[in-house]
Amino acid sequence: MVRLSAFADEVSVVFDEQLKYLNEAGIKWMEIRFVDGKNITALSDEEVMEVKAKLRKASIGVSAIASPIGKYAIDAPFEDHMNLFRRTIRTAQMLDAGMIRIFSFYGSDDTDIENCQEEVIRRLQAFSEEVKGTGICLVHENE
């Protein structure tokens, strides 16, 4: 089954307007990224539950969490990033999202990403291990 899904935050920063647009366009799924200007990964559990209620009322499902995971320099501290990833998994579970979009890091002024293949793979494997057993699929977007 094909699911047509959209980044509704490209239509409006206001979440209610995003849902209205999706319904008017006949799109029943969204890749959720920003809610009222705030990244979905930064929302509290209470805020996520408010989002879920609005989604349910609008009959819109979440196909994926469009996260910023991996969209950081490879030399940034990994533990903070892993904590954000764990939060993203929780958010995906709360919203019944089957996928989390991730990236595969980039270099910095001091670090050429081409020389960091082993570290990139180590980090992606850590994400993969963390999501095991959750039913969530990680989907990679090239930067």
Describe every region a protein language model picked out.
Residues E31-R56, S104-T111:
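Glycine-rich, proline-tolerant flexible connector loops at the mouths of alpha/beta enzymes
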Residues R3-S5, W29-E31, S59-A66, A97-R101, ...:
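Structural preference for beta-strand elements that scaffold enzyme active sites
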Residues K38-T41, K71-D75:
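Short active-site-adjacent helix-start/loop capping segments
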Residues E17-K20, K54-K57, A73-E143:
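Active-site acidic/histidine proton-transfer and metal-coordination neighborhood
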Residues F15-V35, L95-D96:
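Catalytic domains of carbohydrate-active enzymes, especially glycoside hydrolases
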Residues M1-F15:
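Boundary/entry segment of secreted carbohydrate-active catalytic domains
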Residues F7-V11, R33-V35, I65-G70, F105-G107, ...:
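Active-site beta-loop-alpha junctions enriched in small/polar residues
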Residues A8, I40-T41, F78, Q117:
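A generic secondary-structure micro-motif detector
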